[in-house]
Amino acid sequence: MVDQNAAILVVDDVAENRDLLARRLRRLGLSRIDEAANGHEALAAIAKTPYDLVLLDIMMPELDGFGVLEALRADGRLNDLPVIVVSALNELDPVVRCIELGADDFIFKPFNPTLLRARVLATLEKKVLRDRTRDELKRKQAELNEARTLQLALVPPPFAGEAVGRQIAVAALLEPAKEVGGDLVDYFFIGDDQIVLALGDVSDKGAGAALMMARTHALFRALAARPDAPELFADPARAVGLVNEALARGNASCMFVTFALVSVDLATGVLAYVRAGHVPPYLARTDGSVARLGGGGGPALGIVEGFAYRADRAELTPGDRLLIVTDGFTEAQDPAGTLYGEAPIGELLAAGSGGQACLRSMVEAVRAFEAGEPQSDDMAAILLTFDVI
């Protein structure tokens, strides 16, 4: 159904032609009709009024129809403004040129009233559908932007302070590849002497992955609120096993989550960790060496119901830094398709310091390596500096 309030601009240097077109349009029930005698008047009118359709003559003095189309195309107005060319030139070349410049349709003079009616109404109907589609896309984009804001709000702020007599620093980072992503980064204290680091990567991307990420995040946070949380996270295999059961049971989406969970006893420096299909964490020592924590392995969460995960252990000494990343860093690609790899991450960790600046430098290094290639995967990282020297 065509909007009877549609605004139409008739552009022709001959007054009789403008009058004839206007009368035909009014017979269709369209009453909001303006006229312009040349291209300059047309552009001035279009700048002031949001028209729904322009009927444009080609051959006009001062500024012809080609010039009008070129001007509208240059400032992007043709994306929202349909134009029907009304031409006295019974040749295809000028019409083809107009279509290439962005016109939606054409009618030859002298025009057939039935054909004029059909093309005007069809173009206006397409305009309505196009506007609805544009508005729906804007609404969805606004929702995605809001979801991105909410997801980034889940990333905990940096921490620097004292715990059981030690100076602890934690930095976390999340860079979704799309508006929302499937990477999870979190840390929390349990009691006065235990900190838990969590990093996950959902197998998919976009809104579905973000929902899976939010569910996983909520499950771990729920465990952290239990009265037995200190004992539960002292052996992170127990916590990982419980979350895996919840995700694997009835997993109709077949999504899974690679996950690294690390629990650190701040009094002793002993850490226990589980890697559920995740990239091994990096451990940078004060002597400049960087080790990989390759133990504590098992399948990603949500795949094998009832799997018995086992934790592995390591020990932190003053000044050590523990880094966990998702494969959005290591599997970034340059224009030739070469992977960034895991080694450069360790080199940057060894050369840098702790804190948010270190994580940002890693992101910048990956961006430089990609050399303009679009980010293909979410990037998340968490960095713990133990007993800052």
What are these regions (language model features)?
Residues 312-324, 329-389:
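C-terminal catalytic subdomain
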Residues 44, 66-79:
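Short amphipathic alpha-helix used as the core "switch/output" element in two-component signaling
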Residues 35-53:
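Acidic, metal-coordinating helix/loop segments flanking the phosphotransfer/catalytic sites
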Residues 16, 37-41, 59, 64-70, ...:
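Acidic catalytic/metal-coordinating carboxylates
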Residues 15-34:
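Two-component/phosphorelay signaling modules centered on CheY-like receiver
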Residues 134-321, 371-389:
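… and, occasionally, acidic/histidine-rich disordered N-termini of signaling adaptors
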